[in-house]
């Protein structure tokens, strides 16, 4: 849980999200320098009852935490090629992320996820979409959009490259 993940922005909009979607719960899995600060923010904003900071969890158990969720949110501006987006999609979650060119080909707004602008208001609006009917629709097909990034999908792409190279070599 580092500064570059920009979770403090998610925490800032969380009280308004909670007003719009009263059953929502904000779970942050992991450890890092911002963990205590996020806990303080939750207390100050009066939302600590709906926030869980799990602390560190072994990588092999992370899928259990994805399985507990409905939406995966990332407000990061610097980790936009992270594996977490694809892991969340493969787990059947609607991904809500701050838009960045690095997400092209991974998340298409309204199709394979929900993209947000940089402001708190834009993130809040995107999260409300993610927790609504649109997010539920996206979650139903999220895994199919993650499939090309799977080990199998990667192997198929590598095989296709080799086959093209072999064919080009044969043609001379």
Describe each PLM feature range.
Residues 37-57:
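Nucleotide-activated donor-binding/catalytic signature segment of Leloir-type glycosyltransferases, i.e.
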Residues 2-16, 26, 33-39:
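A conserved mid-protein helix/loop that constitutes part of the nucleotide-sugar donor-binding site
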């Amino acid at each position: 849980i580092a500064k570059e993940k920009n979770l403090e922005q998610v925490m800032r909009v969380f009280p308004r999200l909670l007003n719009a979607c009263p059953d929502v719960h904000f779970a942050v899995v992991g450890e890092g320098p911002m963990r205590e600060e996020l806990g303080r923010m939750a207390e100050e904003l009066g939302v600590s009852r709906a926030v869980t900071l799990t602390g560190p969890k072994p990588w092999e158990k992370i899928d259990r935490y994805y399985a507990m969720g409905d939406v995966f949110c990332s407000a990061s501006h610097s980790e936009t090629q992270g594996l977490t987006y694809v892991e969340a999609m493969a787990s059947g979650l609607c991904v809500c992320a701050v838009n960045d060119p690095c997400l092209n080909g991974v998340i298409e707004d309204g199709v394979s996820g929900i993209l947000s602008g940089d402001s708190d208001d834009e993130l809040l609006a995107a999260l409300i979409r993610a927790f609504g009917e649109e997010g539920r629709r996206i979650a139903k097909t999220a895994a199919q959009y993650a499939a090309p990034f799977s080990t199998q999908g990667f192997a198929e792409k590598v095989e296709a490259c080799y086959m093209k190279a072999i064919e080009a070599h044969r043609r001379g």
